[in-house]
Regions:
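Divalent metal-coordination and catalytic microenvironments
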Residues: 8, 23, 28, 49, ...
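Polyanionic/metal-chelating signatures
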Residues: 100, 105-242
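Active-site core of metal-dependent hydrolases
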Residues: 90, 185-282, 297, 337-339, ...
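Histidine-rich, glycine-flanked metal-binding segment
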Residues: 1-3, 10-55
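Active-site gating loops and adjacent loop-to-helix segments of metal-dependent hydrolytic enzymes
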Residues: 69-94, 132-135, 149-158, 197-198, ...
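His/Asp/Glu-enriched, well-ordered alpha-helical/loop segment
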Residues: 68-69, 75-80, 85, 217, ...
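C-terminal cap of metal-dependent C-N hydrolases
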Residues: 6-12, 337, 349-381
């Protein structure tokens, strides 16, 4: 299958200045970018007068696990029976027929990273996937992209009558399973191919092996400054990879975050603060952190903010002082890097997935319409 987009103004998320060119996609991949391209048998799209952006990317949310008009029956992103559930997998709960996914695609969002919420100290794995499809296995780029953990008010609130009444307890529970997972890994590695020497199988600890081996990061929900730095401290203690999600108080600890040198996903920022740890949320935060040298993505945390409004979150960050090109990258290339899938998505480059959002105006404008979205070279209808 061939797709030829002709005459559009290309915003590729690599070069700061846009340029006019044609894009040829073959079998879902970008095959060529240049002037006066031709391809026999290709579907030709006249993009004259349109801006061509890479498909937008969400670094952190819960779309597909909780969507429109679903209530309890369709809310599957928090498991309230145990605060430590690393064995849970987002791919086992995502509903590809959730209407909010299709709506997100029509809004130019082509890739999302979705997973468990923040009720649990350790919630399970996130999945990175395309926003169209019928079977999550076929939609996935990474079926297990990160291991969710959470700090702050949410674990305390959800388990205050059972097992957690303080931030100290939250941290202790996380450290406990990391200690046990490290020992489990040691025994598995020592056993090698000798099955008789393997430790007794433990589903929770087995699920932690990719974290302990550095294959996936801990994806830490943290709003308040002390919670953010606790996540950094624990990740450093155990030598595991880390990404920070929300980072509401990030502007208060800029130097510390620069030193930590971990990817940050900032948001959601629309709406008034609904709890104490959100009191410092501001559209200035993404720009402050970005200017300091932090790796910043902007997120909706869907369904907190509708997924289709991701580009408007970037627009508000620009209004708060963020460089426009950096804000554009914060919803394309940077979240792809945050997730670990920038070899596939996040920019318009030869060899990457043919995911595009064609718009009749500037990405950040409320007056701009998404005229067409393409995922793997196919139109989203």
């Amino acid at each position: 299958m061939k797709l030829l987009i002709k005459g559009g103004k290309i915003f590729d998320a690599i070069h700061k200045e846009p340029y006019f060119a044609d894009i040829l996609a073959v079998d879902g991949k970008i095959a060529a970018i240049g002037e006066n391209l031709d391809a026999e048998g290709a579907e030709i799209v006249d993009a004259s007068g349109l801006n061509v952006y890479p498909g937008l990317v969400e670094a952190h949310g819960h779309i597909g696990l909780d969507g429109w008009a679903m209530g309890y029956e369709g809310s599957d992103y928090n498991e309230y029976t145990d605060p430590v559930t690393p064995q849970l997998r987002a791919i086992d709960g995502i509903n590809p027929f959730d209407e909010s996914l299709h709506d997100a695609a029509l809004g130019g969002v082509t890739t999302v990273c979705t997973g468990p919420g923040s009720s649990n100290v350790l919630g399970g794995t996130f999945a990175a996937y395309k926003t169209v499809g019928k079977c999550i296995d076929d939609m996935c780029i990474l079926p297990e992209a990160a291991m969710k953990c959470a700090f702050g008010e949410n674990p305390k609130r959800c388990y205050r009558d059972k097992s957690i009444t303080s931030r100290m307890s939250t941290a202790a529970k996380l450290r406990d399973i990391l200690f046990r997972a490290r020992e489990y890994q040691r025994k598995v590695d020592l056993a090698g191919d000798d099955e008789s020497k393997l430790p007794a199988f433990n589903l929770q600890l087995h699920a932690m092996l990719p974290v302990m081996r550095g294959q996936i990061p801990l994806k830490a929900h943290a709003h308040q400054a002390n919670d953010i730095l606790t996540a950094v401290r624990i990740a450093k203690e155990f030598g595991v990879k880390l990404t920070l999600e929300h980072v509401t108080d990030g502007a208060l600890i800029v130097d510390e975050l620069v030193r930590a040198n971990v990817p940050l996903a900032v948001g959601p920022t629309f709406g008034q603060p609904s709890k104490i740890e959100l009191k410092n949320k501001s559209w200035k935060t993404p720009g402050i952190l970005n200017k300091a040298g932090c790796h910043v993505s902007i997120i909706t945390d869907s369904p907190v903010t509708e997924q289709r409004h991701l580009r408007f979150c970037a627009a508000m960050a620009v209004n708060g002082g963020m460089d426009p090109f950096e804000a554009f990258r914060a919803v394309t290339l940077y979240p792809a890097e945050h997730i670990g899938i920038s070899d596939r998505v996040g920019s318009i480059e030869v060899g990457k997935d043919a995911d595009f959002a064609l718009m009749d105006g500037d990405l950040f404008s409320l007056q701009t319409n998404v005229v067409a979205t393409y995922i793997l070279g196919s139109p989203v209808c």
